Amino acid sequence: MMPHPAIAIVAPNTLASVGLADIIHRMMPGAEICLFSHFAELNQAENRDAFFHYFVSAAEVLTGASFFLQRQHKTIVLTHGE
């Protein structure tokens, strides 16, 4: 049996993160979704390299630029606009 994919959401906006987590959960019911408010929280996590994808706010990508640059094929930058 394959392990469930793990998805990290790194964004300071809790409401947006929970909403995105719900959308992802509906598309991938078996996925493990972890929410982090800031890059520092993700960086301290023991499983920080185990994620299949990282959904990250633009500000947090800049904070952890070297981390996300090494994982650019897994990183999806979240932006907001009108």
Per-segment meaning from a language model:
Residues M1-E82:
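N-terminal regulatory/sensing modules of transcriptional regulators
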